[in-house]
Amino acid sequence: MVADEVKYPAGFGFKDVVSHGISGLVVLDKSSQTVIKTPLFDDCEVALSRERHIYERLTQRGGHERILRYHGTVESGIRLEYAPNGDIRRTLCAQEKEPSMKTTPKQHQQWALQIAEALAFIHSAGVVHGDLTCHNIFLDENFNAKVADFAGSSLDGTDLLVCVAASHEYPGPTLSVKGDIFAFGSVIYEITTGAAPYKELSDDEIEARYKRGEFADTASLGQMGVVIQKCWRGQYDGFEAIIQDLKAQGENPIMPAT
């Protein structure tokens, strides 16, 4: 990101940036403890417009506590709830460096359930996320998961504007509920193991293995591993069944599957 080429919201600059992606720049508005997401460059406005329409749809449907709250538009961007603990991937990276920050199986189960509940609501509103990774799931002040980043998502069957990482990509139609379910399986795998599936392999090799139905081993992950495999193998038709399976795990999601 070249600072002097970026479009900042009025009154904000490089010092206020908390995150950026391929299409959007996120700055912190300290006065309201919200963030403003704007197009990174002029040619990114289509993606941000898509995201705005999706947030408006989700808000019209009542919103959901596991999705970043939408606070309307700002210039060509949108104002969203601020998640002070960053994204889940940042937390996973931090625990590698500092063992005292290691997350627990109970925390993993909570995140999995919160993300699944968010996705069930998202799909009910005619939205396919299409880019579900730990980078797009944020943590609020109480470390509750919040799904976000709809700039590449589909609304009412429109084309996806982004491709998800190979480790999370469904070996079938990606513009589908099953595409998000497959990615969810990879998200939970990363949360429970600390690394994306097949992290050591090239994108081409990952794609080839997925097409052959060869997925990362989850035997050591107990009941959570069973859910992950069912996501990858297309054994769920929607998130409602996933939510039921996650709730049935009780307090011991890593206990051996029966």
Locate predicted features.
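Conserved structural core of kinase catalytic domains
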Residues: 66-105
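C-lobe/activation-segment region of protein kinase-like
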Residues: 144-146, 151-241, 245
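Conserved N-lobe motifs of Hanks-type protein kinase catalytic domains
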Residues: 61-65
